[in-house]
């Protein structure tokens, strides 16, 4: 069963793996650093799916993301403005990253996030440290 696409306030990026394109949904309040984290991942070879607003839908117990047509391939670079970047039109979302500026547990219990009855792993992360991108990459690779 396929649920209708729904926009969600989040940024999404994807990395090519031997299993195909695998995506990460980066969530958090405005100004927390979602786009900044995405830009750092893009600098490591990832592709943008969508910035700020992401179409998210479930099909066969799998989550997928794409960009609204009006913002496809565009991302905000704070202090520079809206820039264009290569993008991945669609990808399977494997991991949710909840961005926060609050303290993050060093060894947290496993957490999940559910959208439209599909549950995926969830990582709580402060996006500001330089290592944040590598933490996301490591978490995705472990799935």
Annotate each predicted stretch with a short phrase.
Residues 16-22, 43, 47-101:
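Conserved nucleotide-sensing/catalytic segment adjacent to the nucleotide-binding pocket
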Residues 10-12, 53, 110:
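Short, acidic/polar N-cap/turn motifs at the starts of alpha helices
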Residues 18-42:
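Glycine-rich phosphate-binding P-loop
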Residues 1-22, 27, 59, 143:
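Extreme N-terminal, non-catalytic leader segments
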Residues 4-6, 49, 106:
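Short solvent-exposed loop/turn micro-motifs enriched in small/polar/acidic residues
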Residues 34-36, 82-84, 110:
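A generic local structural motif
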Residues 89-143:
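Conserved NTP phosphate-binding and transfer environment spanning the P-loop NTPase/kinase superfamily
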Residues 25, 49, 124:
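Short, conserved beta-strand segments within well-ordered enzyme catalytic domains
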């Amino acid at each position: 069963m396929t649920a209708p696409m729904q926009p969600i306030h989040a940024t999404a990026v994807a990395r090519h793996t031997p299993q195909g394109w695998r995506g990460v949904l980066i969530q958090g309040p405005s100004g927390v650093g979602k786009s900044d984290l995405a830009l750092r991942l893009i600098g490591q070879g990832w592709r943008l799916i969508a910035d700020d607003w992401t179409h998210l839908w479930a099909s066969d117990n799998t989550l997928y993301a794409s960009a609204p047509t009006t913002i496809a391939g565009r991302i905000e670079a704070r202090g520079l403005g809206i820039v264009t970047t290569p993008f991945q039109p669609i990808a399977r979302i494997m991991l949710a990253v909840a961005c926060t500026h609050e303290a993050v547990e060093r060894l947290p219990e496993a957490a999940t996030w559910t959208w439209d009855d599909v549950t995926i792993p969830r990582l709580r992360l402060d996006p500001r440290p330089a290592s944040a991108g590598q933490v996301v990459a490591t978490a995705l690779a472990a799935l």
